[in-house]
Every structure is written in C-alpha cells, then in structure tokens.
Amino acid sequence: MLFLSALLACGPACFSQQVEKFPLGDYVELTDTKPHDGEEVWSKMTAPVRFCWGTTDVRYKKLNVPDVKATGTLRLKAWKGERVNAQAVLWTQKELEGAEIAVSELKNGSSVIPASAVNTYFVRYVMTDELNKDGSGGCGPRENKAEWDSSMVADVLDIVRVREVQARSTQPVWLNVWVPADARPGKYKGTLTVSGKNFEAMKLPFEIEVVNRTLPEPQKWAFHLDLWQNPYAVARYYQVPLWSKEHFDAMRPIMKMLANVGQRAITASIMHKPWAGQTEDHYDSMIFRMKKLDGTWVYDYTVFDKWVEFMMNEVGIKDLISCYTMIPWALSFDYFDQATNRVQFIKAAPGEEAYAEYWGTFLKDFSRHLREKGWFEKTAISMDERPMEAMREAIKVIKAADPEFKITLAGNYHEEIQGDLYYLSIPYGNQFLEEVKAERERKGQISTVYTCCTEAFPNTFTFSEPAEAAWTVLHAVAGGYDGYLRWAVNSWPMDPLRDSRFRTWAAGDTYSIYPGPRSSIRFERLVEGLQDCEKIHILREELAAKGANGKLKKLNAKLSEFTPEGWIKTNKKSPAKMVSEMNALLNEM
C-alpha cells in the first residue's frame, strides 16, 4: 500500500507531462487545407439545406457537396440483440444555428423499440495521413508531418448534442439502434429528425425488420476479441492522478464499450515500459518491486489488484489477464533498491543468470498472490513479437517458477514453442496448419490472428475504408482462427480528437475509441463484423446439425472470400460490397 499511497498523495504534480487540458466536451476541429468544392458548386444545390440517407461505407468530405441521392425510407434488417448502423447526411449553403438530432421510438403495431435503444451522433472530422509512400503499410517514422499527405476525414462519433454547422459544409449524422433481445419480430418504423434555430426541421423515415433470431450477449460470443487497453493514456488526457477515483471514473465508460463488444482480455503491465515507451503515454509497472537491504525481494500488488478488480467487477471483462512482459524491447528491468534508496535497473537478457533470478523470484511470488486472489487460472505471462530463442529462455524461467503458468505470444509462428503457448496470435497472412490448429483446440488453447501497422489492407487507420474493420474480423473466422487481436484501442496521440497522426505509424493505428468516450466509424463497423462472426458461428452449428449441407456450403463459400487468396479470386472486390453481401446472406438464412 505504501507505493500507491505515495503516488496518490503526490497528485497532479506527479504528472509533469500534463501541461494542457484537452477537450472532453465540444471542440474546434483543425482546418482542412485540401482543395474542395467552391461557391460555384455549392450554389447549384436545389435547396439551401438538404438532409438525406447516405451509407455507412463512405467518409463524406466536410467541404464537398456529397454524392447522395434522395431516397425514401431506409430499410435495415437485424437479429434480436443486434446493433445496426445507418448514416444520414446534412449539407448546407448557409450556416446552421443550433442544429440538433432527435429520433422517435420505433413502432411495430403495439410493439415498441424505445428511443432509449437508439443513439444518434454528429460525425466529426479528424486529421489523418496516408500509407507509406510505396503503399506497403503504415509502419515507420513520421516525425515531420509535412512530408505526409494529410487531410480531414470523418470518423469521430461526437457526444455533443447541439452543433453550429458552417456554411458550405457537410455534416454527417450517425444512427445506431441496439435492438432489444426480447423484441417481437416484425417491421419497426421510426423517424430521424434534424432541426435548428434558423431552418425548418427535416425528417427521414427508417424501418428495421427484426428477424426471429437472437444474438447472445457479447460476453457469450464465441469470438475471442483482444484489444489492448492503455489506462495511462486516460490519466494524461483527463488530467487526473493515476489510479485515483477520478481515473477509474474516467476509464469506466471507455472500458465498458469494450465489454459491450465481447472483449475477453485485460491488458496489465508488470514492468516499466514493456514496449520502450513507443506510445504517447508509456505503460508503467502495475507491480512495485523492492530489493531489501538483506538482498531479499518484496512486491506490492496494490495497483495491479485495483486494475484487475475494476476490470472484472465493474467493467465485466473477466476471461484473461494478459501480463506484459518478460521480454521488453529494451532488456532493462526496474526495481526500488533499499540500499541506495532509489530506482535501479537490471540489464539482462533471457538465458542470463541475472534475468532468471530477477524474473524467477518474482514469478514465484506472483503465482502465490494470484492463487490467493483466485486469479491464477485466468492469468497469463504475455509477450509480443519476440525472437524464438528469447521466448524459449523466458518459457524455461516461467515453468521453473510455476509449471502451471499460462503463456501467451502475439508474434510469428514457431513450431518449437507453439505447444507451450496457451494463447498464440499470429500476423495477418499467416495460417496455422490444420493439424496444429486441431491439436491446439483439443488442448483448450487459443489461436488468433492480429493486424498492426504492417497491413495496407485490411486495417483500421483513420483513412482506411470503413468496411475494412468488419472485413478484418470476418477474415479471422474465414481463416479458421479463434478470434482477433489488435495492439491498441486507446493509446491516444497527443490530441486525439483533432489529430489522429502519430510520430511512428499511420494515423489512427494507436486507437479506435476517442476520449469522452466517443465511438468512431471504425469501431462501429468493427462491431458490425463481430456480430456477423457470431451469426456465422450460430448458423454453422445449426446447419450442420440439420444436415443442411447446401446452405452450409453456400455460407462457407461466401466466407472463403475473406482470406488473402479468396479476396484475390474476387478480383479484389471492394470490402464494402463483400461485407454487405455477407450481411445479407446471414440475414436471409
């Protein structure tokens, strides 16, 4: 407790990097300097203000007249318990004062989906950049932003309810309906309305056909979702002391967004800078280590326990505690040395005696603590993208400390160690051999796929096509993986609401949830894909049990397109079209 008490007593003064209060409410976007439609284009509008249904597949440009055609009623299909999205587009010649959105309840005879199940958002614009110049992906230094083609793109789903809309601009509106699990099947009709102080209210009708199928609660989905959390970014952005009540209050709604989409793993850091401070807000150790005068070690788990208890009991993410890492990028390990009364570092590589002593002593005590808390079976010692020989040496130390410890790796496949890995996530474009995957499944091991800055496609950069988020997780099912891992969901850059660019990777690589919390087009499309993955799981089991081989073959054939080789066979069909076709097939079965 001494470690935490000292930290909290220090308060905001401990956080010298916190020099600016960043916006949580309304804010001013950066200026878009790209060429855009001028007065001569905007003057051709048939009415000074227009409001029409668009598509969730497009990021509409703020300063261009959108390519949208007037339609009647928007029609969507949904399972009970499913979330469905739509995007409307408001564009105007004149400034709109006090624009706000309203939505009615949805009615199907005497049955109602309440307005409380419907969320609406103004879509906001954030600065983005581009792929590497050779189109190969988004990895590599980007310190000089002037070297990269930057522009403003639609992505943020804002929580501000009333907005001023500038003249000659486009303002998208996002609609999200979470159909109640007990909704009666049928067609529900509702209305989306935009109104303001200086323009007439405009209405768009929509209809959701609820089919007689039910999605389970997200935590019961078969898909293993692992999006890494960064509590340190929240403390910096919200200007609150680490691990204070205010910090947990700020994190709660952010982390609940993850629980509500089936997140399985808690990201815990068990050493100082496990990734060498690669993010704007580096991870620190949640476990305090002290070497006493007599050379023995003591460990304080106060912060680790608070974080895990919060995530399990208040947020509802309970399946796995991923503890990073024993093999950091910089092989330097911190501890407080009582003899010198200061923090010291041990430099040691896997295979060296100093490494084995530092980690072996800790892991034995950590095992004891986890067993006392009842968390041992849920906890894994986790590594990512580390060389095989280093992994082998680390595994030896782990097994010597407690042979029952679970071990995870996100990195290249190595046959020599895969059997030791309870959870192995391999890069996009790599596959598990069929017999290896079957054996891992038999042993209760988890086998997933991950993407990062490497992939030009599919990805969830802020300039990526929105449908790529759904495509990515559908690929996980198509490739026979158990789920999907991405290394960051809220490792925010300095000013994430206005500028998604980062010094090391393509814009948006480090996050898909914004402060507020605010969702994003990317995150909502990811949810769409996750729901389709669960539908596929349900339908495959059902069709196999019924012996409906024709329908099963049709489903698997469509799903096979969501692999690198399958996509090529489609002549690289647009991800938007592929996801739409898959969604339609799942809803008709």
Protein language model features and the residues they cover:
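Bacterial Sec-dependent N-terminal signal peptides
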Residues: M1-V19
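Mature N-terminal, pre-catalytic/accessory segment of carbohydrate-active enzymes
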Residues: C14-A276, F376, K572-M589
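Short, glycine/acidic-rich beta->alpha junctions
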Residues: K80, R184, D249-A250, T302-V303, ...
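Aromatic-lined carbohydrate-binding surfaces of glycoside hydrolases
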Residues: W148-D149, L157, W178, Y188-G196, ...
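Structural detector of well-ordered beta-strand residues that form the stable sheet scaffold
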Residues: S322, K406-T408, T448
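Catalytic domains of carbohydrate-active enzymes that cleave complex glycans
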Residues: S332-Y335, V343, K347-Y413, Y481, ...
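Aromatic- and acid-rich polysaccharide-binding/catalytic face
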Residues: T408-Q431
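Catalytic-core region of carbohydrate-active enzymes that cleave or remodel glycosidic bonds
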Residues: Y423-W505
